[in-house]
């Protein structure tokens, strides 16, 4: 990825995505937080907010837009329908397609939830000398459905989804320490080591994103992931749901340090 995308302002990044750039957003706009998106009809909004409250590791809420609202302080002057590089649309729990914008599907009763994303703490990992494999390899982060259930809330339930980053064995404690300071963007890992222990049979076949090579001496480390709501949508089957395509996030105007705790 070019230096210019790392240095791009969030507004410039969103403008590029609005114009049709459709790439994963890891490494975009260094120093700014990124967010997952879940958009649901108002009739499902309370149940989903309760689901997020009961599952704060995969679903840390950064903001909620009013029904029909298109922007907020996280994307001032933006448009939630167009400012993400790629969207997914679900109907009755089935993936209907991926789209560069979702204006044609928009309704005034739709409530947008912005959910913390682990791309936000990748800069802190790099600043501490901890390598991030998918950035080094030019790939999307790999994500996997697990055998760990989420806490049910109203109509919403489903499996926990995790992202995976292979970390040098000698730096795992540092990775835990660094990411634990970002609870609003998934925080510390939920699992280290054997993927089979959480129901993942093959790291080379992620459910979302791209597989990455695991270098010698590296251990797979798993963080709760904001794609978990999409897995819940597949189980819950709301009439309509709109989300980001995995790895294609909303680049917000919030500084990543806003979500760092001492």
Swiss-Prot record:
This is Putative hydro-lyase cu1581. SUPFAM superfamilies: PSTPO5379-like. Signal peptide: none annotated. Its EC number is 4.2.1.-. Keywords: Lyase. Belongs to the D-glutamate cyclase family. The keyword Lyase applies.
